[in-house]
Amino acid sequence: MSIALLRTAAGSAACLLTFLVAGACAQGYPTMLQISPQGGGRCIEVPDGDFVQDRGLQMAECNSTAAQIFVYDPAAMHLTIGDLCVDANGGKPGDLVKLSPCGAGAGQTWTSEPKGNFTKLVGQNGLCLDIRYGSKENGAPVQSWNCGDSEPNQLWIFQRE
């Protein structure tokens, strides 16, 4: 089942992202999901399921393994996999998105911008979650990049697991 993300009012302390899943966000429950780009067929994954600090993320065929199942925590606005957070790492366009220990770092905070049936994930640094060179091939790295209104490599579909 696809999940769309909506931005809630800026004053909402309980949940800045709302999942269209019965009560998931309102209850503050973490939600497990796969993340696919516009056009589908691929998912973001941790290469080789190697959940270690500074490990970059990449695109791969969707397969529902633990390496592709992320958890969104609406209270912290963190996207996690294993016990690590997805981190914008550095904050410059082209920096690879990596895993790091969860904390209060701005690079670990992700908000969303609904774009029709898709969602952009925007880091607190103002850069978007992006596929390098727009490639959806296996192994294509995930990076942060300047947000654009017509960037298909920044539009994501969330599949609930």
Residue ranges and their predicted role:
Residues 11-21:
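Bacterial N-terminal signal peptides
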Residues 1-13:
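Bacterial N-terminal signal peptides that target proteins for export
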Residues 27-161:
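Lectin-like carbohydrate-binding module/patch detector with strong preference for beta-trefoil
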Residues 22-26:
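Sec/Tat signal peptide C-region and signal peptidase I cleavage site
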